[in-house]
């Protein structure tokens, strides 16, 4: 970037840009934000705006692009959405009063994790994550700058850190330590995160907890430092940090949540077709955010679950009151977002009017709950603080039709401030006086077309055409000459104009000052507003669960202290809703206390996966406080759910289906307890038949002997059904089929015992494979069944015979075996093991 012979303004730009090399610098110049040099070239392409140049006639013209300040937010949103940072440099003084170059400073750096304003605000959280490390310990802190929520936890390995970041759907991570090359590869390339570094700490005794572990303390304080460094203002809406443990909630990793379609459909990436879509009858943005949080983190505390259930039951029992409650919630705006705008100093009159409207709805909501006369609701009612003094202040001060821009005037109600009313009176009377002067001078001069006009240059003036110049009174003085007319003034008109201009300026200044005082006063209520937002959100979520329970015919589940599962005529609620008018076939799931594993067999497409997901979905719904789809349901409280359902290859990181299967299986058997739920669907299909079967059997045996977790294990290895005779806690179940006159019907019904056929050719027929291909497959199948062999017969005689080593013969020792024998696998990370395997595979 050349800096020779730059103008003072461009030198100022260059100096500021040096401080923010990783951000687009939006440099305020009048009514535009300008970008220069590489920023201009890149922004023009990304934002699809014109690229021009400054000093076009110079040897090296400076590339330039700009966006209007009043519509800048939509352009900022595009840059942030694509993972860039944006630094905003504002004019810090009035250009008209500046001596030399206008003073400019960066007032905010907007990053993917610190977005507060947006041209498209939504109800999703935007979490900014910070991680720090001390030895093998990790501290992970995160916050949402809109809601002010602030959390921290401690984790024991980098895999758990990545899992938590995925669960939070964070886009930016603040790093308090230097990443290894491997860690950077995972975070930046595989997880596509924006990485920011922060070495300094921000010590805030109000927000931080001195009882935190050191690494948790540093992760929290560095996150605070980064937020203050980028936002450059007081953040009074941030809540004190809350420490949590992942084990305090029903644990599910990112893959499990994705396979169960908890908050979005895994195939479409959209809300529709997810549990969130099913349960969301919320009426407020806060309620929607809280519901999503409850789905992500179901409870393991029976007392808290039952507390939620009881409120849902109250709402079910009071239909008309619930209907009134729903209507009242529709008048509630996003209090958390409004509170953050107050804290950021960005509140406009519209925000305050929305806040007043919300506060005026609270007494009605509270009265509805009190009218139900249920002790269960007492804790909710206590959170509904209407803050009447704040609602009264805003309603008395802000005009109902106030403009959004605080400098446009007309913000403050008439009658709120006596001095402001006087200025407005002068303006109104001045307008009347001008009309009177116009009429008087028209009559006295005899100029019938005489009129008073106004523009910024000449102020108020009499407009006289050339044909009437001979009738101009002597006390008129010329202000401007035009081609066909002239403009005149009088001392009287000038005096009134002066009074009006003075009143207009004083009125505007006073109105702005009053609004600033009101905004400052509102800022004193931020904590109470946040508490109110939490209360309304909780009410909203619980009424939503009641509505869904009623419309989807859900029942209240019971929790036992044993490990028994007894779900009578259970349904997969999301699948049922998607099916619409079609008939959903319910299934009973029963696992006695001494049964830990159900081995599920049956044809593809028969409903094995849905049956397994049904159990997991029911458990999640039950533990977040929702009612569940069944005739009756008795469940244990699970501490974790592990799944391997689906076969999506992880192509980005180069991991095959089988590798993903093995990693997820390892995650389950490493972390599951006897109180966990494990779902494995067709484990082992990503490798050779014998390998897959051997692994599947050994995993089943390991879970049976060492873990004891409730497990549904669906398999196409029918040989595994014989395990029922040797594993006392395993039972076989299968998906029933009806075979009649050569036609096969899948009944989607789970019955005891193993399946006798796989019906793979029938599934292929449904998929539309050619008839001659299916006939050939049927012939091969008959030959295999007659021969009792696992290997298919050759299509034709080959000219050479390839000898295959027996699976059980001892082969010559391969050099790779020697290398494997040297590995100290107990002191290696999973990633190191995988890297070694990749290297060895390349040698084969």
UniProtKB/Swiss-Prot annotation:
Residue stretches in coiled coil: none
UniProt cross-references to SUPFAM superfamilies, sorted A to Z: DNA repair protein MutS, domain I, DNA repair protein MutS, domain II, DNA repair protein MutS, domain III, P-loop containing nucleoside triphosphate hydrolases
Family matches, as InterPro entries: DNA_mismatch_repair_MutS, DNA_mismatch_repair_MutS-lik_N, DNA_mismatch_repair_MutS/MSH, DNA_mismatch_repair_MutS_C, DNA_mismatch_repair_MutS_clamp, DNA_mismatch_repair_MutS_core, DNA_mismatch_repair_MutS_N, DNA_mismatch_repair_MutS_sf
Record key words, sorted: ATP-binding, DNA damage, DNA repair, DNA-binding, Nucleotide-binding
Gene3D superfamilies: 1.10.1420.10, DNA repair protein MutS, domain I (3.40.1170.10), MutS, connector domain (3.30.420.110), P-loop containing nucleotide triphosphate hydrolases (3.40.50.300)
Record CDD domains: ABC_MutS1
GO BP, one annotated term: mismatch repair
Family, similarity comment: Belongs to the DNA mismatch repair MutS family.
HAMAP family reported for this sequence: MutS
Role noted for this protein: This protein is involved in the repair of mismatches in DNA. It is possible that it carries out the mismatch recognition step.
Protein name listed in UniProt: DNA mismatch repair protein HexA
Organism from which the protein derives: Streptococcus pneumoniae serotype 4 (strain ATCC BAA-334 / TIGR4)
